[in-house]
């Protein structure tokens, strides 16, 4: 129920008296002709309404959240605490660099941390989300080729196991998408790659480990082939949480990458709030990095603008990135240090392999049974679909009833009826075992009463929604009657 539906018409809203301003310069077509529709609720009722709504949310603070390819790890409260210090929180975007030296030093150190972690030589913190970072990375690849007058290079190679944003980003940058298949063992089909490489190749976009949850074993071969063809390698940092301190994209041969700080560096996810997707490059692309960046001159930290970066692709936003998120990431990195970040990846990988082994032990089908999981893995429920008529969606809806957020469903698309499961390093054995037991119980229900699963969830404010109607009759703006 939305708060407007609780209106009883008895509590007229009151406002503190204020001096009326001059509205004579406001165009008449912008003036109200009738009173606004307000909920007419007392302050206590409003507080209770939204508090109760918040308790119905699934979030990391309340539930196990094994959403594959999303790295829903715990957001440490210390990072929130220190990022909320007045010196950070009250900094105005127009404040002079001289007056915010502490903030700039933190950002400068974060740039250096990302360089060390990824094996790159240049970093920009300007992108305000992972998708924007991805756009910046491909835009730099395009700018690189155009500077060399290689205007015919307008193709980006994207494996079928890539993130869905990869082909979208290439399209937005005006490039053509060339898809290549993944083999049954989870590695890229090298023969298929050979067939599409050529004078039109601008680059290839990869995630390593890939979205099928395994490490691409032929990455050195792929890098050599793409570079020999004149293309560049783009690293989607979605799965960087699996390899911190163990392997670096720059050492693998990648030329540019973006990081998702809400994944790898534990900054808050979603909610429509601010994101951050820094980009890192090798020497080939440093001159194209988006601005602003933080530099150091005569022991003072400064903003580097367009005049300071010769062939920058320019600004991505009006100001200087989402500083509050970047500060949280800096604090996270400082708290863990190099050894701690490495340990985080080790435990994330250990947890994923533990869950994969346990689910296999319980009789579930692993999509790539002969491969070790990275930080995530895929279960295919195709046998359950064929034997009992239940789908991955049915399992997911029933998991919610059991107090566990569902894993990612039907992604990647090349595995039928799949769940992509990522426990992250911040979960313990008890929470993972609770999930495994829930999966076993749901399968038992599927054997005895598959129709019951078709009706899940039963314990939430809303039951199974009509996905087809929602897609065909999209209505995202609610208005009171």
From Swiss-Prot:
Its EC number is 1.4.4.2. The modification N6-(pyridoxal phosphate)lysine is found at residue 263. It catalyses: N(6)-[(R)-lipoyl]-L-lysyl-[glycine-cleavage complex H protein] + glycine + H(+) = N(6)-[(R)-S(8)-aminomethyldihydrolipoyl]-L-lysyl-[glycine-cleavage complex H protein] + CO2. Residues 1-26 are annotated as: Disordered. InterPro entries: GcvPB, GDC-P_C, GDC-P_N, GDC_P, PyrdxlP-dep_Trfase, PyrdxlP-dep_Trfase_major, PyrdxlP-dep_Trfase_small. It is an enzyme of class 1 (oxidoreductase). One of its GO terms (biological process) is glycine decarboxylation via glycine cleavage system. Belongs to the GcvP family. C-terminal subunit subfamily. NCBIfam families: PRK04366.1. This is Probable glycine dehydrogenase (decarboxylating) subunit 2. It comes from Francisella tularensis subsp. tularensis (strain WY96-3418). The gene is gcvPB.
